Design a protein with these regions (language model features):
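Extended amphipathic alpha-helical coiled-coil/heptad-repeat regions
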Residues: 516, 520-524, 530-714
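His-Asp-centered catalytic microenvironments across diverse enzyme cores
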Residues: 368, 383, 398-399, 441-442, ...
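Hydrophobic/aromatic-rich core segments of domains that either
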Residues: 190-195, 199-201, 213, 386-396, ...
Length: 715
């Protein structure tokens, strides 16, 4: 990466450039000048590092203004993007990078400028948590990449080799593989038997159901852990073969193949873990399991693999049956970023891809196994057995099962394997998935959630990085939705707003503060989903009035846009961001200022409990706060939405908890909560048609704060 002094000098020059280019015509007019300047500086930086870039490669980028903006205008330092694009071209060839899969190449180059790839991959194989790359992409001359899918890395060891002394792992494997067959219960899917009507005609057959069957097979490590009798045999066998110190005691069916209960006995859990480690280590040492997980692919290998699959020649019938392509890989690069982030090892991908390609298998949900999944060691012990893949792989998730995190991983990874951008996502106490999709009729893109459990888009945070603002990191679902909506509203205008952000960031702080409102007005006129510009403007707002003005500018542009007007979550998210900025700024100095600010906040339907509380206290101290919160409780009780909307009930409960947090002292907090409960007397429960009466979550929260017991339900 460039030396810090070089970056500092570049920043100074960009400040001058941006200040001159913006002028009176606004930030959009500076986009082309900024891109041209960054092009020159980036090519100079490449040359200074000895990175040879062919003239025709540079000319190819220059020939397409949108491509040039994407390469030179979307990162503060475009050099990693430029070199990654060239590196991909060296490995994959001009046809893939310059013609058929340019957008995928840009997405990978952009993604890899944010998140470094490593041999081990990332925890959930979506680049979440990856560090910024320390090295630049390699553009040295080399032969084109030949895509090779690794084979099974296991090399079985002869555990009876007479030419050497057998070790403890040999004996463990020999016990298992030489043992007589045992009865084992397995779950299988079977179609129900055919039924016939009175005329002897077969009725439509039902769906396959899971049934348990007993089969004969040699024991696995998991079988020994599950059986006290097999444990006794194992201990005797190991002692007879010179290893009396190797003993296991896991109880009888404390953990078994279909266990769902967690192990609460700490000593028992430790003994089961020891047994698991014995079998697992023996399987790995003797080639029954891989010694380690396969390495993650390079960016070129990853792209080559996706391109190869995209070019697969399905016949028309199979293409229709597979709904192929699941997502167009020539889609604009911003909507491909979650796919570009995938770093699953190729062999793991290939196994799932082959089943999809040949048999149409597309499974996005595995076996849900209950509380034992919260104990990874016990989850692993219940099914430890030979397998061609390691822990962390989707194949191991299929074998072992899990809870929501495993299900989300299976879903997101499977979507990406078939070429569809996807990621896991967090909800309160739950893991879900999100994915990009394209409407076949309208051609529009959307970011959609799946496996939701504890709320909708409004409580969902995507794990894949939101890599559009030069910072990256996790963002709420709506941020990723704005990418799809923004591309629908105009791919080039969307990229223009990303370049505008770079121009804006290069301005001096005082100039950014002065232009905060105009940035939003001008940016959203170009593309109404430029949330990155809104964030930047709010961060630069020097006082509450400026933040209020930024939100007003946003609302005016969104209201004028047919595409954006109905996006309520987008609008409330920006509203909440604006009011969070107001809260972070100094409060008004007197009651008059607090009242004026409160009027503006109420006009903007402020839902920030802490900010409202600060304003109320600024107007009239604690008595004003108490009166205002009681008024809010009465309005909530009289609202018809209270009975209709669980979301509204939970929102008010959250506000009540936030207000309580602002009350100092345990006794004062309890007194405030008791007063807040008074309007709820006789109305503590919610009656929803078709359901049992349930306690209002606000009442539950206030009772805990007040230290009062639950009262009998009233009508």
């Amino acid at each position: 990466m460039p030396h810090p002094r070089t970056l500092a000098a570049l920043f100074v020059s960009l400040v001058v450039l941006a200040s001159r280019a913006v002028g009176a015509d606004g930030l959009l007019s500076a986009v082309d000048a900024y891109v041209a300047e960054m092009r020159g500086r980036t090519l100079e930086a490449a040359s200074a590092r000895g990175a040879a870039l062919p003239a025709d490669f540079v000319a190819w980028i220059d020939s397409d203004p949108l491509l040039a903006k994407s390469v030179y205008g979307c990162r503060k330092d475009p050099l990693p993007v430029l070199l990654a694009l060239r590196s991909l071209e060296i490995d994959l060839g001009e046809d893939a990078v310059r013609r058929t899969h340019t957008q995928l190449a840009i997405a990978i180059a952009m993604q890899d400028s944010y998140a470094a790839r490593g041999a081990q991959g990332t925890g959930w194989n979506d680049a979440d948590g990856a560090k910024t790359p320390a090295a630049l992409p390699d553009v040295s001359p080399r032969t084109p990449l030949s895509l090779v899918i690794p084979g099974d890395p296991r090399v079985p060891v002869d555990t009876k080799d007479p030419s050497r002394t057998l070790d403890v792992h040999d004996h463990i494997v020999n016990f298992l593989e030489d043992h007589a067959e045992i009865d084992a219960e397995i779950a299988v899917k079977e179609l129900p038997p055919l039924e016939y009507d009175e005329k002897g005609v077969a009725k439509p057959q039902g769906k396959a159901v899971t049934v348990m069957k007993t089969v004969r097979r040699r024991p696995l490590g998991a079988d020994v852990i599950a059986s006290a009798a097999l444990q006794a045999e194992f201990n005797a066998f190991m002692a007879a073969n010179g290893h009396p110190e190797v003993r296991i005691d896991c109880g009888d069916r404390a953990v078994h193949w279909y266990s769902t209960e967690a192990i609460s006995d700490k000593d028992l859990r430790a003994r089961i873990k020891t047994a698991h480690d014995l079998f697992h280590d023996a399987y790995r040492a003797k080639g029954r399991m891989p010694a380690e997980r396969d390495r993650a692919p390079t960016m070129a290998e990853s792209m080559a693999w996706f391109v190869r699959n995209d070019r697969h020649a399905f016949d028309d019938a199979t293409r229709a049956a597979r709904q192929w392509p699941r997502f167009p890989l020539d889609a604009p690069w911003p909507v491909l970023m979650m796919l570009a982030a995938d770093d699953q090892p190729l062999r793991e991908r290939e196994d799932i891809w082959t089943k999809f390609r040949d048999a149409g298998e597309f499974r996005t949900y595995g076996e849900y196994i209950g509380d034992i999944a919260q104990q990874f060691d016990m989850q692993s012990a219940r099914r430890v057995a030979p397998i061609a893949f390691s822990y962390g792989s989707i194949q191991m998730m299929w074998k072992d099962g899990g809870v929501c995190g495993t299900m989300g991983n299976i879903g997101a990874r499977t979507h990406r394997i078939v070429g569809q951008p996807a990621s896991t996502a967090g909800q309160p106490g739950h893991c879900a998935i999100v994915f990009m999709e394209r409407d076949a009729k309208t051609g529009e893109f959307r970011c959609k959630g799946g496996q939701y459990a504890t709320g909708g888009d409004e409580v969902t945070t995507v794990h894949a990085g939101w890599n559009y603002d030069d910072r990256g990191g996790r963002r709420p679902m709506v941020f990723h939705q704005t990418v799809a909506w923004g591309v629908n509203a105009g791919f080039e205008p969307f990229v223009d707003t990303l370049v505008m952000l770079r121009v804006y960031d290069a301005l001096p702080p005082e100039e950014r503060a002065r232009r905060a409102t105009s940035l939003v007005d001008e940016g959203l006129a170009r593309n109404p989903f430029a949330i990155a510009l809104v964030e930047a403007a709010l961060a630069a707002a020097p006082d509450p009035a400026a933040a209020i003005a930024v939100l007003d500018a946003f609302e005016a542009r969104v209201e004028a846009s047919d595409a954006a007007r109905g996006r309520e979550l987008y609008r409330t998210t920006v509203r909440d961001l604006a009011h969070a900025r107001v809260l972070a700024l100094p409060a008004p100095a007197d009651a008059t200022g607090a009242a004026a600010l409160l009027a503006e906040l109420e006009r903007q339907s402020c839902a920030n409990a802490r900010l409202l509380a600060r304003c109320w206290r600024g107007i009239g101290g604690e008595s004003e706060f108490n009166a205002r919160t009681l008024d809010a409780a009465r309005r909530y009780l009289s609202s018809p939405e209270r009975a209709k909307s669980k979301r509204d009930r939970e929102a008010f409960a959250a506000m009540a908890r936030a207000w309580a947090d602002s009350v100092k002292g345990k006794a004062a907090k309890a007194a405030w909560a008791s007063a807040m409960l008074e309007p709820f007397a006789g109305h503590e429960t919610i009656e929803v048609r078709g359901k049992k009466p349930a306690q209002d979550p606000a009442v539950e929260a206030l009772r805990k704060l007040a230290g009062t017991p639950a009262a009998p339900a009233h009508g």
